[in-house]
């Protein structure tokens, strides 16, 4: 069985929309595209390089379209990006010239991929895919890149529908610019109790 890891850049108020650039995702009138750029530094770059090791990818259609134009020309930064399998959840797009791309449709297809043999899966961006995974308890790990700002609007990582779940902090890094990079692993059901005394 493959592990599914979600990697998401988020703000303090949970916004994950268009961290990479002004034109990345303008849906809903979003005007803060590129909000993560001021927080990039050497420390965050080291963590990102570690995470860009060969691993198959599970992407939504919008993220895939952005990546399809960009990453094949930037393999110096992510050498394995062309050779790993890119599973794309889409009901409208069904073909691509980008090598090793497989289009899938629906949660059952994702379950089959997760239960098959192969490398672990990473989910970058892809807010709709993440919501589907959260609702169906298919996320094994979260890598959250928590940026010290609020935006007030935009697509959020947790919008409702996630099942109650516990996570354990496995690793964390805080950069000089205040970016918190935290790796959480699924740890069973939510436990409750009484605080204090």
In which residue ranges do the predicted regions lie?
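Portal/gating segments that form or line small-molecule/metal binding sites
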Residues: 1-138, 148-197
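Short, conserved catalytic or interaction motifs in soluble domains
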Residues: 141
